[in-house]
Swiss-Prot record:
Molecular function terms from GO: tRNA (guanine(37)-N1)-methyltransferase activity; tRNA methyltransferase activity
GO cellular component: cytoplasm; mitochondrial matrix; nucleus
Residues that hold S-adenosyl-L-methionine according to the record: H205, D243, L244, D269, A270, N291
Species of provenance: Entamoeba histolytica (strain ATCC 30459 / HM-1:IMSS / ABRM)
Family: Belongs to the class I-like SAM-binding methyltransferase superfamily. TRM5/TYW2 family.
Localisation per UniProt entry: Mitochondrion matrix; Nucleus; Cytoplasm
Protein name: tRNA (guanine(37)-N(1))-methyltransferase
Amino acid sequence: MEKEQLPELKYINVNDFNINEKVIGIPVQTNEVAKYMKMFKGLCYNRIKTKCVIPYNSERMILLETPLKEQTQKLIQDNHLKTVETEVPLTIKNFNVNEIMKRYINKNIQLPSSFETVGTLAHMNLKEEQMEFKYIIGEAFLIKNYPRIQTVITKTAEISNEFRTFPLEVIAGIPNTEVTVICHGVKFVLDYAQCYWNTRLETEHIRIINQMKAGEILCDAFAGVGPFAIPAALKGVKVYANDLNPTAVKYMRINAVNNKTTIECDNMDARDYLRKIVLEKHIQPNYILMNLPATAIEFLDCIPELYLQHCMIHCYGFSPLPNAEDLKKKAFELLKGEYPITIREVRDVAPKKVMYCLSIFIESTKHLTSGNNVPEAKKTLN
């Protein structure tokens, strides 16, 4: 099978790295290679995708880290070993990503060291001083990670819209932001430029889904492309899912089909959606998910007008306070009462910004609803 062709590079010239590197080696007999490799452990030539033992005449030569360290010189002298200067032909594959970047970037610029992987896409958060060299950085990471990574992007501004997406730029590779991600055996397709996705929440998705049983009903008010909804449906949960982002809903429907499961999807405001599910369709969910940490807590204000029974609400939010006491207070204000609540830290997002999950058990909201609004509820599947 032919190796996949690296996408066209515009800023890095791979020929810049076609050099012969001068290295010092010690000729040894073939049957003594193991002995001297042990003696010079940690002192041998160690460039990536090269060998430190090469043929030499009819014997072998052990290549050493050059220039020679003081310890290496002493071992050579004490063991009366001969040294030979040779050259190792190198290409760009023999250089690590930092070495490639340093070839073009001012040494005073801090180099990026990591990225988030989403399918075949690498998401980098470059700092302001790195943006001048963004295309060099992107191509360097592409070269060293291709074909596992085929597109490199960087965020160009913070999240500022209701869909939780952010402005981004493709800085290397194929200009395509549609990716396929597999999480715990479930395949998701999404356009990363137009849909929210966070790989770091994979464990949280599974933790919540593990609480559910086949035959129960889930109402996911901010479902995105379906990271909660699809695995829940595969478990036998009846899933009603909604998102305000029409592109996310499009991909959620695609993901349901691809995973051979069924979800009832809507594209509307979350408050209107919850009213539709409970008050108009007379559906009683066992679980309501509200995963929009920036504003989800505000949507609890519609819960009192619904007729809910034995419903667990998982609502996510950000707080700078230990135990998210501010979120708890706000939740009870909007719910017009105090309910059993468990607050759990999900992850640190930034200094003094922690993501929490508020799990609120609603025994009944009947006392808060007018008689005209109380529907005949369906709690489990027929």
